[in-house]
């Protein structure tokens, strides 16, 4: 860094598995509450934190917004497309924004309702280190040095396993060869967030990876403490509103017993209706100032949450009557609609996902710009939609939310390790999950429905994939782990822990918590309970559909793969692409060729694909004795004419074979450019053919007629 003028730079540095990571501040974005740059290798991420002076009124959540952007200048590129500037967030940027948000959010104290805005930008990106985990560290560090009551620090790292050894913050090249790729975030004392995928590894290996990552997380937390000791501001405290406390005390004394009774109602709608009635009755009995009416609703929700938690922790019976480890009833249907290539409905209690699979041809891949590869093609896509009617809400649908994009990515990651490679199954695959009904764990219903839908489509997956969402209620040392959580248990609980995989191991994992950490013992117990539940669901899925359908839908595109001699590829293409254009125009297919002799034909129906295959086979076939062909005259001499039967394959039509009558010169009957129908009467040892015009009988069809139509 070069320039003029005096600046003050505060910088701290540590090593993660011998790779330096540094955090610096002091000379940029000084009007924000806190700003840092985090570096690893030549990758650098800038993060700024701004906190509003006033709190929002009448809300019961932290108004935290995270915006992460990857600038193309960071890796020396100009944005593609017509508009040469960055636009709305990409899917990758949305996913990383969520990755930053989730470990940061639980670190703020209850009752803090000031707006918190985190802005992260990748300023430099090398071809080694992913900036996403650096952005987590940067967000925590930027908040930690501000006056905000942030109870961190937290740090995030990525852990992979290569040749049986764990690696923290690996390079892209190492990640591509590993069988685990998980982002872990935590404090010095506990794990806060887990997000990632693996190739059917055991729960024990996943737990070992998380704990291994935590040791490096501790170093990065110490690094942030060192930075705060140099530049940190005095933290503000969250003041308790005495009027809110009065309303809470009076309201709770009135509603407690009635709410406890309401939780004996097992039906969700009826239960929620009764809980609402209790509130309407209670507010008539206490004094609530007009400016506190909305806040009273927030306070009541908190009371209801606490009563539900107490009931489940004490009685070990959930609000729908289930035991903590009990899964709701499941029903499955496949092959629902004839025009869809593959379809399934997966229903678990009041959660229902309709999942459709569509098969496409090359060229229909999703193209995305990425830091790692520049332009990346996605052959397998999974999209998740959460319409308002699924929860009974009367509002119009909108564009996919960050949550929908995140849930789709989680399910896609769970299924992807089981998708056959392109050599085995040369289709582009798009899976769409429509949530028809929601009462918890829709992303895991999507995983189950997607696996069934792919089987129904005939995609040759070797195994089913299932997912389960686990929850947690914890008060001091007392806790209960919940299997297959409801929506209320998700909203009112302390953890949302999703695990997906096959009978042989985990393929995807995601954990979000609302408390300040999770111990090894609870994490281990949750993984074991999730495995048991997954096996139960997989048994039902295999019962419904034991294996992929042997045939694709008749409405799916037809793909034919051929192997030809590499020297035949130019013949298929023809001069200036003449031959391949003719095949495409006549059949409507797509054709992919490579120099190794691989030919792929893609068509909307089997008839078109078969016709294209036949045309290619005729084009590259060897000349056969006794067969009739059409050919173009390329040269004429007195003794005969040279006729091209196939591209580059000349035959001799001797003057004596032109007509039953005797003629002196071939030039009397034939000229260059004539199209003739001839029969092969001889092939010598060198493969040279002799043909006859006079031996052709009426009704004989030329084998290569299509070339001349």
Curated annotation (Swiss-Prot):
Cofactor(s) recorded in Swiss-Prot or TrEMBL: Mg(2+)
A biological process term (GO) from this entry: mRNA catabolic process
Domain S1 motif, chain residue ranges per copy: 626-694
Record domain KH: where: 557-616
Protein keywords: Cytoplasm, Magnesium, Metal-binding, Nucleotidyltransferase, RNA-binding, Transferase
InterPro entries in the record: ExoRNase_PH_dom1 (IPR001247), ExoRNase_PH_dom2 (IPR015847), ExoRNase_PH_dom2_sf (IPR036345), KH_dom (IPR004087), KH_dom_type_1 (IPR004088), KH_dom_type_1_sf (IPR036612), NA-bd_OB-fold (IPR012340), PNPase (IPR012162)
Molecular function GO labels: 3'-5'-RNA exonuclease activity; magnesium ion binding; polyribonucleotide nucleotidyltransferase activity; RNA binding
GO cellular component labels: cytosol
Entries under SUPFAM superfamilies matching the protein: Eukaryotic type KH-domain (KH-domain type I) (SSF54791), Nucleic acid-binding proteins (SSF50249), Polynucleotide phosphorylase/guanosine pentaphosphate synthase (PNPase/GPSI), domain 3 (SSF46915), Ribonuclease PH domain 2-like (SSF55666), Ribosomal protein S5 domain 2-like (SSF54211)
HAMAP family named in the record: PNPase (MF_01595)
Family: Belongs to the polyribonucleotide nucleotidyltransferase family.
Physiological role: Involved in mRNA degradation. Catalyzes the phosphorolysis of single-stranded polyribonucleotides processively in the 3'- to 5'-direction.
Listed name of the protein: Polyribonucleotide nucleotidyltransferase
Lineage per the UniProt record: Bacteria, Pseudomonadati, Aquificota, Aquificia, Aquificales
